[in-house]
């Protein structure tokens, strides 16, 4: 018997972004529950339910960006994956030690200070 498993990409409906320590102090507005939105730069984006922040893929850096909804699709944000990790991954599959945040310059986040979790709806067919 042959099984075909097809992952259609980053289709998680609801994700949780949690920040701790200095990342939280610098970027607290980015923390919360995000809902799946339209594709941006060829990949799924998510919008924070309670304010005007979003999570999207940035092709030039091949990383995920968490920033203002006004900056959606650009390279401008307050938290980002670090090291070209977005091209073959979903943001909730990026290691918790592979993020950086802005605080008068980019700072590599300590392990587990930036956490992104898929809460609902990432079905594999």
Tell me the role of every PLM-derived stretch.
Residues 1-9:
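Cleavable N-terminal signal peptides of Sec/SRP-targeted secreted and luminal proteins
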Residues 8-122:
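Interface elements of modular peptide-recognition networks comprising either
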Residues 125:
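Extracellular carbohydrate-recognition regions
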């Amino acid at each position: 018997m042959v099984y075909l498993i097809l992952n259609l990409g980053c289709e998680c409906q609801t994700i949780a972004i949690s920040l701790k320590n200095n990342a939280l102090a610098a970027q607290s507005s980015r923390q919360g529950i995000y809902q799946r939105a339209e594709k941006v730069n060829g990949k799924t984006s998510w919008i924070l339910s309670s304010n005007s922040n979003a999570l999207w893929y940035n092709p030039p850096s091949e990383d995920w960006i968490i920033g203002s909804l006004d900056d959606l699709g650009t390279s401008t944000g307050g938290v980002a994956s670090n090291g070209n990790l977005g091209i073959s991954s979903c943001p909730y599959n990026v290691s918790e030690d592979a993020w950086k945040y802005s605080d008068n310059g980019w700072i590599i986040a300590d392990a587990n200070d930036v956490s992104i979790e898929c809460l609902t709806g990432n079905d594999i067919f």
